[in-house]
């Protein structure tokens, strides 16, 4: 039985790597130009770190909503987790924080669980590493990193009611390139849509996604300053020593 399992594991890994280019960096990336398939091979160490996933417009066929170089949304703070079947991307709830030594920390953790944003079936295993297919995440109109503006009641109030809307065109979309480095992975994709507004036309964008690992020893938080060009967000600070939640930026 052990031999059969080992043979099956080797066969699965051979399938995902066949014809693909294997690059090592932040973690191993397997990209097949012919099939368009993109795989991440994650070691156990990848599941103990936090990452930033940034989503930027690299080029566009219509500047109504975004121009080249503009951030599409607020960068996501994420972490990978896994079970026997799947790997998950968890969205870290960084807006709400508490000191880990505070008496309310245990209760806080139960009420601010980091939600699972996306799940990937484990496609293969290799020497303790797990391999997942991330083609659809980076090569299709994934909701959390979509280049289409989300229309809501608030967006209508701020003049975004006429944002470009469209249906995703899979046959006109592709992952263009993948580059790996020791601390980051860069992925650029062309995503195409058929607009569904008053004027129906093709709409294509090139989106650049950056996945980079954060330091194991986090930098101390500081107040937001427009003179410093780093990402910032609001913090709701919970404490048993105060009778209200303190908000800071």
Regions found by a protein language model. Name each.
Residues 2-249:
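Auxiliary tRNA-acceptor-end handling modules of aminoacyl-tRNA synthetases
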């Amino acid at each position: 039985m052990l031999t059969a399992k080992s043979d099956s594991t080797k066969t699965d890994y051979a399938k995902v790597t066949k014809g693909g280019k294997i690059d090592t960096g932040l973690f191993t990336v397997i990209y097949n130009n012919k099939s368009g398939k993109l795989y991440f091979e994650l070691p156990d160490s990848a599941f103990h770190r936090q990452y930033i996933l940034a989503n930027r417009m690299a080029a566009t066929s219509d500047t109504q909503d975004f121009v080249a170089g503009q951030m599409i949304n607020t960068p996501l703070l994420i972490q990978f987790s896994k079970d026997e079947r799947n790997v998950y991307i968890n969205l870290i709830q960084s807006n709400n924080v508490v000191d880990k030594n505070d008496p309310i920390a245990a209760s806080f953790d139960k009420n601010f669980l980091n939600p699972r944003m996306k799940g990937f079936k484990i496609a293969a295993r290799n020497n303790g590493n797990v391999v997942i297919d991330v083609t659809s995440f980076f090569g299709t109109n994934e909701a959390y990193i979509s280049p289409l503006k989300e229309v809501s009641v608030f967006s209508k109030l701020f003049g975004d009611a006429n944002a470009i809307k469209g249906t995703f065109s899979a046959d006109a979309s592709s992952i263009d390139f993948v580059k790996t480095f020791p601390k980051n992975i860069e992925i650029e994709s062309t995503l195409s849509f058929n607009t569904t507004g008053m004027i129906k036309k093709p709409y294509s964008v090139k989106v650049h996604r950056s996945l980079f690992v954060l330091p194991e020893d986090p930098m101390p938080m500081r107040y937001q300053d427009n003179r410093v060009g780093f990402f910032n967000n609001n913090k709701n600070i919970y404490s048993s020593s105060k009778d209200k939640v303190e908000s800071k930026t």
